[in-house]
């Protein structure tokens, strides 16, 4: 695993950060969730993502929305699009990461309930290569993508 740095170099007394490398979820789903949780309060983001895990609310898909069906839980006025899905694995990883950033904020002496997500980014991680045996002695490549996710929280007054 390669050591990676934060893409945003924000520092300060009211900043808390968390990062996870090479997660086993879809990079496209991670990008869409990062777009969703950016500028949300941390507790609100966790509550929304827990509803996504329970398949109650959908994540709006803005970028990777080709052939994505419209969801009743999304109205076009709130998010600007009605296309969405329920990325359960990526949502669970984001919940774990946001809670980790809140614990880092608590350790730094900040109030975790007053934290807002000012930066959320998802980048492609390492591709784990594999092969899938086929008939007649052939083989098909079977690659598994990973994703690097980072969250930065700031305390609001």
From Swiss-Prot:
Q: Name one GO molecular function term.
A: rRNA binding
Gene Ontology process terms (BP): cytoplasmic translation
CDD domains, per database record = Ribosomal_L22
* UniProt cross-references to Pfam families, sorted A to Z: Ribosomal_L22
List the record's Gene Ontology CC terms alphabetically: cytosolic large ribosomal subunit
Q: Look up the domain of life of the source.
A: Archaea
**InterPro entries from the entry?**
Ribosomal_uL22, Ribosomal_uL22_CS, Ribosomal_uL22_euk/arc, Ribosomal_uL22_sf
Positions of transmembrane segments: none
Q: Which UniProt keywords apply?
A: Ribonucleoprotein, Ribosomal protein, RNA-binding, rRNA-binding
Which SUPFAM superfamilies does the UniProt entry name for this protein? Ribosomal protein L22
GTP-binding recorded as keyword = no
**Subunit organization:** Part of the 50S ribosomal subunit.
Q: Which PANTHER family match?
A: 60S RIBOSOMAL PROTEIN L17
Family under the similarity heading: Belongs to the universal ribosomal protein uL22 family.
Summarizing the function annotation, the protein's role is: This protein binds specifically to 23S rRNA. It makes multiple contacts with different domains of the 23S rRNA in the assembled 50S subunit and ribosome.
What protein am I looking at?
A: Large ribosomal subunit protein uL22
Instruction: Write down the species.
Output: Methanocorpusculum labreanum (strain ATCC 43576 / DSM 4855 / Z)
